[in-house]
Each structure stands twice: as structure tokens, then as C-alpha cells.
Amino acid sequence: MIASKKVRYPDLRKVEIYVLDDGDREEIALIAKELNVKYIRRDNNENAKAGNLNNALKETKGNLVVTLDADMVPRVDFLEKTVGYFEDSKMGFIQAPQTFFNNDPYQFNFFSEKNLNNDQDFFMRRIENQKDIYNSVMYIGSNAVFRRAALESIGGFSTGVITEDLATGMFIQAKGWKTRFVNKNLASGLAPENFSDLIKQRDRWSRGNIQVARKWLPLKIKGLNKVQKLLYMDGIHYWFSGIYKMIFMLAPLWFVLFGFYSLNARFSGILTFWLPSFIASQLAFNRVSQGTQSILLTNIYETVMAPFISYSVISDAVLKSKKGFTVTNKGYNTNKKYYNWRLSLPLLIILFFSIIALCKSIFVIFNILPFESGKDAIYINAFWLLYNVFILIFAVLVPFERPRFRKSERFLSSKEAQLLDKESHLIIDCKVMDWNELGAGITIECNNKIELKEEQKIILSVNGYELESVIRRIIPKKGGTNIGLIFTSLNYEQYAYLITQTYAVASSELPIREEKGNNIGKLLFDIFKGHFILKKK
């Protein structure tokens, strides 16, 4: 809420902020009142999020409507970077990518926070950008600005499915409105922080896409052109990839262990059809990803999710289950490490039998064991078994949950600051290394001994703001000292300043390169180093 109040706009009298609450939470109403933010309460949660948004449309009047999930924090330049597009009278909505402050389970549990992108970045920053060329940008539920007239032309946000966003954007485009994707980090939130919550989120997304296809098949939507229909069908079809991945993993097992054929063809015939397809898909993938994603890493992600997404898709597409909307838990922290055996069991079983099948293949190749179908049939299956085992080893490491100690994410900084005593007298100059609304890490470049001690009350002075703090940790280093601080008493202006310098900092002022080139070699090194260090500790 505070970040929304700090968003820049030429005439802030035209900006109204609303908190939409369909859970009747009195504490939320009190916070909204304290911050002078308008509060819209709904007595029920009919149609979940879409119903909540539609209810708010009836209570508001603005020509432009921004939708933000509760965990999404807009940057101060959000409106500056989006509203200008609506000078085009046919512009229906603007979509910015969802980005995240924290590390997802892949980044965190692989010990590869510095070398891996968030697994959603490929879609959010690359695929959406390509869809923009064909006016097929998908509305992703948050970080978007709508023209009210566009929403009214389709009767408001689509209801009756658990992913209202996909259908809403599709219908707006079908009405002839233009849409744009602004590929800038304009609002960030929290990604799922453990394997269980990640599965819940993807379960909801997959079921929602299937529900959209059952209720409003894109191929039959009047107003969409052929390319738009194809791209929407492709987005829905993606969720069936879990089934394909399961077949891909199980087919070599069926053949090597039980002699079941999934494909009866000569090796030369397979190469004739498969090799050109593989090369073409690899080139296309590299073109779209622009070095920020790899095929191997994508296969790891898809393998991890395959058993669960397959179940979700079959449940909704075939069995037509009635599972409703569920909210993904955010803000998870724990000081424990554990392995999620229950959720990893399907992957462990497939890995176990893949290793057995691979060993049998090797014995057949070296004439230790006979094989009715002959050795020629074994070679290609042995290759895919080896590949699957390699991928599955990575996959079964994802449910290994590391401790998450911090209650809030820290943000890098290089701001000059000063440490003051309780009477605001200067102790020494310092620099902020990282901080959030709860505390800060600072560094002092000084060879002389500093008379500071843990639990001492001091003041951190930054840009005119004097932040009352307590020293929690002092770590000597060569040529200076690193100090960990906890803020003890912040007024509104101080708290708002910290928010604008951390969560809501302008997109142009982000201190680090947002996208990294995913590298499987670095990932291997990170995993082995991380598990060795964690075990040692």
C-alpha cells in the first residue's frame, strides 16, 4: 500500500488506491484507514479474484484500472512507464512482466541464486515479448493497466474459471482492442518459496488453462485472427507437456525392462524425422531465449513438474474435476532443512527404475545379458535412459528444502551513510551494503578499532533520515568492519523511504543485471559446492 502511494504521476489527484478485500479482514481495513487508502469490502468470495475485481469496477470510476496482486509491489515509475501508451484510443491493456524479489525453489535449492534466473522469467520476459508482435500478449493477472472501456466491452473480468486472466485478455483482443507488453521490471512480488507451494501454483495454472479451453476454446472465439488463435492454443497446449514428458521418461523403461514397444521403427527412420525437428527446435529456442535459458535446464524444470502437471491436466481435461481457486502461500521462512519425500516419491521411483533399465542396457550392449529384440534396439533406448537419469538426478534435488532465515528479502545498496550515537553525534561514516524495512547490513572502511558492541543502540543516518537501530552482529574484515543492524522504531516517512529505496526503487535504478545466462556447468558446481558446505555446517 505504501509503495502504491509513492508511485509518481504528474497529477496525483487523479490517482486513487483501493484495497479489495473479500475475506472481511478487520486488520486490513484498519491499515487502509491509517494509510488513507480506500477500502472495498465484499461479503463473499464468489468467483474468487475475478469476482473481487468486478465488484471493485462497480465501486470505482477511473478511466484506467491497474491490477496488482496483494504481494506485488509497484515501483515508483510504474505509471510513468505505462500510462502514455493509452494516448492510442484503441489501446485496451498494457502488461508488464511479473518479477520477484526472492529466489524460487529452483534457484534456492540448487544453491544457484547468482547463476539462475527465476524459472518464470523465460515466459514473462521472452515469450510475452514475442507475443506482443502479434497483439497476443497474455494478461497474467497482475502488473497490468486496463482501459475501463475495454473491460466494459467484454462485461468485466471473466469468471467461471480459476485463471480469469487468460480469458480476460483474450476477449479484449477479440473485441479489436490493441495490447502491449512493456518489458520493464515495474512491479515485483514473491515467488513460491518451497516445492510444495510451487506445485500448488502450477496445479492452479494448469487447471485454469484447461478450464478456459473447455469453456472458451480459442479456435472458436470470433474476433481473434489466425495467429492469435494459434498462440493462445499454444499456451494452453503447453500444459500437456507434462504428459509428453512422462511418456518420454517411461517409454525406454517399458521397452528395456518389459519389452513393450512405444514406437516400432528403424534407427535410420527415427533420425530422419527426429534430428531435423530437434535441430529446428533448438535453434528456435536459442533465438527466443537469447542466451538466458538452456534446453537442459528447461528439461529439468519440466521433469520436476511432469508427474504433478500430468495429474492436474488429466483430472481437469478428462475427469473434469471441480477443484476451485487456491491462493499460493508466500513469505515462507524456516531455520530447518528437510527433504520432501512425499512429493519427491514419483521422481525417485522413475529414477530408480531408469537406473535399473540403464544397467540392463549396458549388460546387453556388452553381451552379458541376452535381449530378444537385439542390440540395435537397445542403443537408442540406452541413450535416452542415460539422458533421463542425468536430468532426474537434478530433479530429485529440488525437493531438498534449505533453511530460509530472513523474514524479508534484502536489497543491494551502495548508499553513503553515517552511524550516530543516541544524541545524534557522529560516530563514523559507513556505506549500506544491503537493507530492507527491517534492518541493514553496513560496512565501515577503517583500520582503527571502533568502539561498538553487539546490542548497542545507535542511529543509521541515510539521506537525512535517522533510523533508530540496534547492532545485532559485528564481523571484522580486512581493512574494516561489517555490521548487521535491526531497525527498532520507524515512523511513516522513514518506513516509506525504505520501501522506495528497496522494493519500489525505480526500474531504471535497479542495482544489478536482472537476467543471467543460465549455465548448466555453473549449476553443477553450485549444487555440489552447496550440498558439501551445508553438510559440513
Which residue ranges define each predicted feature?
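Short, acidic, metal-binding catalytic loop of nucleotide-sugar glycosyltransferases
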Residues: I2-K14
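Short beta-strand/loop segment that forms part of the nucleotide-sugar
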Residues: R13-G23, I40
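A conserved acidic beta->alpha catalytic loop
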Residues: L20-I28, N44-N45
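Long helical/loop segments within the catalytic core of UDP-sugar-dependent glycosyltransferases
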Residues: I40-L64, V76-I162, A174, F195-I236, ...
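The conserved acidic donor/metal-binding loop of glycosyltransferases
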Residues: D69-V73
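Catalytic donor-sugar/metal-binding loop of nucleotide-sugar-dependent glycosyltransferases
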Residues: F171-A187
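Membrane-embedded multi-pass helical conduit in multi-pass membrane proteins
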Residues: Y238-G324, Y339-R402
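Structured alpha-helical
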Residues: Y338-K537
